[in-house]
């Protein structure tokens, strides 16, 4: 009986920890360039258009009920010709799961992933230097940490890849997250949406999102408040000890 009670308690505590981890992830996170964000500013599913940001970077968004969105813009230099860098834009969304060991597993909706590869000096660039295609790639991260950056006071997400190497840090940009609808955007069955109905669904989703008072996280005021509160507490405690 004691063993059964222990196991029940163990699983309950484990579920609570996973729930707290999911709450920590909620929001839209962006890399230091602060130019790449998930949502309609990166991918237009109605026009099948990936929109190139001003600077390279990455962005991830997470909801508390297990949905995610990914926006990647990477530029790779060409060692043989520095004027011919290769650019890649990738959009995916789907569901994510936090495993009991703290790893993060993301499963995309296969019909919705898109990739735009731009190679201005490639072999087949006489007609078009860009290749637009479907893209699907499951992702597994070994672990992640959410913390407050000691330098700028912003919330920071540090993700570690499957081999344990850290990715570039991400910073909280929007909460609630800025995302497209979490269901399939490009269904392929007989009940496929028209562009008009898809446009209306996206518009309705974004309108509902704005009603949640999504806000951009750029101020560190609340962190400064707690910092100075802690300093004041330490000073008060020191004064009491000194007077005694």
UniProtKB/Swiss-Prot annotation:
- Lumenal domain ranges by topology: 20-222
User: What Pfam families does the annotation carry?
Assistant: Rot1
Which GO MF terms are attached to this record?
unfolded protein binding
User: What sections of the sequence does the record tag as coiled-coil?
Assistant: none
A biological process (GO) annotation for this entry?
A: 'de novo' protein folding
Task: Extract the signal peptide range.
Answer: 1-19
Kindly list the residue ranges recorded as spanning the membrane. Answer: 223-243
Keyword list (alphabetical) reads: Endoplasmic reticulum, Glycoprotein, Membrane, Signal, Transmembrane, Transmembrane helix
Q: Which residues are glycosylated?
A: 81, 101
The text of the family note is: Belongs to the ROT1 family.
Q: What does this protein do?
A: Required for normal levels of the cell wall 1,6-beta-glucan. Involved in a protein folding machinery chaperoning proteins acting in various physiological processes including cell wall synthesis and lysis of autophagic bodies.
Name recorded for this polypeptide: Protein ROT1
Q: Taxonomically, what lineage is the organism?
A: Eukaryota, Fungi, Dikarya, Ascomycota, Saccharomycotina
| Gene name of the record | ROT1
């Amino acid at each position: 009986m004691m063993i059964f009670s222990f196991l029940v308690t163990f699983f309950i505590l484990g579920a609570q920890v996973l729930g707290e981890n999911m709450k920590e992830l909620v929001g839209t996170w962006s890399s230091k360039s602060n130019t790449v964000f998930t949502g309609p500013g990166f991918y237009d599913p109605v026009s099948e258009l990936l929109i190139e940001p001003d600077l390279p970077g990455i962005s991830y968004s997470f909801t508390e009920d297990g949905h995610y969105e990914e926006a990647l813009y990477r530029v790779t230099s060409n060692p043989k010709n520095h004027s011919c860098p290769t650019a890649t834009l990738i959009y995916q969304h789907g569901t994510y799961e936090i495993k009991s060991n703290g790893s993060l597993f993301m499963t995309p909706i296969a019909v919705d992933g898109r990739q735009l590869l731009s190679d201005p000096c490639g072999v087949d660039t006489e007609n078009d230097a860009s290749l637009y295609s479907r893209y699907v790639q499951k992702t597994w991260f070994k672990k992640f940490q959410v913390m407050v950056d000691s330098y700028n006071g912003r919330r920071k997400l540090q993700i570690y890849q499957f081999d344990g190497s850290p990715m570039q840090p991400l910073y909280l940009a929007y909460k609630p997250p800025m995302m497209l609808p979490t269901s399939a955007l490009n269904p392929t069955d007989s009940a496929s949406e028209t562009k008009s109905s898809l446009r209306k669904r996206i518009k309705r989703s974004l309108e509902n999102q704005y009603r949640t008072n999504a806000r951009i996280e750029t101020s560190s005021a609340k962190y400064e408040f707690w910092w100075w509160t802690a300093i004041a507490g330490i000073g008060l405690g020191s004064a009491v000890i000194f007077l005694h």
